[in-house]
Amino acid sequence: MATLLFFDQGHKYTLDGVELPSVTTITRFLSYDYKSASPWLAQTAARRGSDVHAACAMLDYGEEPETDPEISGYLKAYLRFLMDYQPDWEGIETPLYDPGMLFAGTPDRWGHINGRRVLVDIKTGVVHRHAVSAQLAGYELLIGGFAPEETYALRLDKSGVYARGRYCR
């Protein structure tokens, strides 16, 4: 059985020691590349996004994340989403790879909302429509037989509000 490893440093995936391109790497050309324009901004946004994702996963697993004032608004937004939609997640931040196309990624959430199969990508910054559509399509390939009926970007804001944008499949 092949071994997929995810390395947070550099956001890299390897399959039996061979680096695989990620969904994010493949789709990044579809949006403004703020990473090259403002590297310091990219590092700050990436750290914040990782912290928010980790804290949201803790909430999904019934754990209480540490209170960090920098991300508390984002968590408040996620808690509001959970209360409003009461999702039943089947997958949470699970690194996966496609054995045929040899790419990897970590879909944020997939499961059920109101009896419908959904795939959700959590965002803490600007949502670039074309990039998110491509990213969700890549994640849909990775989750295989789940076949979501709806795909969403869930934008969490530091003000404590969320926006759920539906993307065509």
Show which residues each predicted segment covers:
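Nucleic-acid nuclease catalytic cores
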Residues: 94-169
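Metal-dependent nuclease catalytic cores that hydrolyze phosphodiester bonds in DNA/RNA
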Residues: 1-104
